[in-house]
C-alpha cells in the first residue's frame, strides 16, 4: 500500500501517509526509542499517536492491532507525557512477546523485505 511506504527522506523519521513507520536501527541510524511503539514492536509496523496519549499501532505481517486509549490531559492530573510514552513502549513490548511466534509462522523463507 502506498500509504505505508516511507514518504520522508532517509535522514528523517520514516512516515507514510499519516503513519509513523518503524524501521530497523541500521536504517534509522538512531535509537528505536524514537519510535512511539518502542524497540520491541516489529520493524515495518505502522502507527499513529494522539495528543491525549492515545495510540494505534499495527503489524501488517501478523495482522496484530494495538489500540491504547488514554486521557493524559484530564484537568485533575498533572502533565504526564513521559509516563504515557513509557506506558506505550511497555504495552507494545509485552504484546509483541505473544505476537513473535505468530509473526514467524507468517513469514515465508523466500520473502524479501526491502526498504526505501
Please describe what each predicted stretch is.
Residues 1-2, 84:
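Short alpha-helical "patches" and their helix-cap loops
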Residues 5-65, 97-109, 113-115:
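Active-site Gly/Thr loop motif
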Residues 19, 80-81:
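Domain-length accessory/inserted modules outside core catalytic folds
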Residues 81-105:
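Surface-exposed amphipathic alpha-helical segments
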Amino acid at each position: 500500500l502506498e500509504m505505508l511506504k516511507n514518504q520522508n527522506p532517509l535522514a528523517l523519521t520514516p512516515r507514510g501517509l499519516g503513519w509513523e513507520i518503524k524501521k530497523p536501527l541500521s536504517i534509522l541510524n538512531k535509537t528505536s526509542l524514537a519510535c512511539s511503539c518502542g524497540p520491541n514492536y516489529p520493524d515495518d509496523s505502522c502507527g499513529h499517536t494522539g495528543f491525549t496519549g492515545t495510540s494505534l499501532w499495527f503489524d501488517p505481517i501478523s495482522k496484530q492491532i494495538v489500540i491504547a486509549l488514554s486521557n493524559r490531559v484530564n484537568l485533575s492530573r498533572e502533565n504526564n507525557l513521559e509516563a504515557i510514552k513509557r506506558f506505550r513502549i511497555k504495552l507494545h513490548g509485552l504484546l509483541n512477546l505473544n505476537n513473535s511466534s505468530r509473526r514467524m509462522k507468517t513469514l515465508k523463507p523466500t520473502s524479501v523485505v526491502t526498504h526505501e
